[in-house]
Structure formats: structure tokens, C-alpha cells
């Protein structure tokens, strides 16, 4: 859960998915 949220934030900020 926490890892998913962190990945989502990094994805939005870095725009690297």
C-alpha cells in the first residue's frame, strides 16, 4: 500500500511511469 502510494507520487512528479 505505502509502496504503491510512493510510486504513484514519484510517477506524477518525475513523469516517469
From Swiss-Prot:
Cellular component terms per the entry's GO annotation: extracellular region
Single GO biological process annotation from the record = defense response to bacterium
- Which cysteines does the record link by disulfide bonds? 11-17
The subcellular location is:
Secreted
Record bears the keyword Secreted: yes
In which tissues has expression of this protein been reported? Expressed by the skin glands.
What keywords appear on the UniProt entry? Answer: Amphibian defense peptide, Antibiotic, Antimicrobial, Disulfide bond, Secreted
**Role, per record:** Antimicrobial peptide.
Q: Which family does the similarity line name?
A: Belongs to the frog skin active peptide (FSAP) family. Brevinin subfamily.
Q: What is this protein called?
A: Brevinin-1DYd
UniProt organism field: Rana dybowskii (Dybovsky's frog)
**Lineage of this protein's species?**
Eukaryota, Metazoa, Chordata, Craniata, Vertebrata
Amino acid at each position: 500500500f505505502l509502496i504503491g502510494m510512493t510510486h504513484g507520487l514519484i510517477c506524477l512528479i518525475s513523469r516517469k511511469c
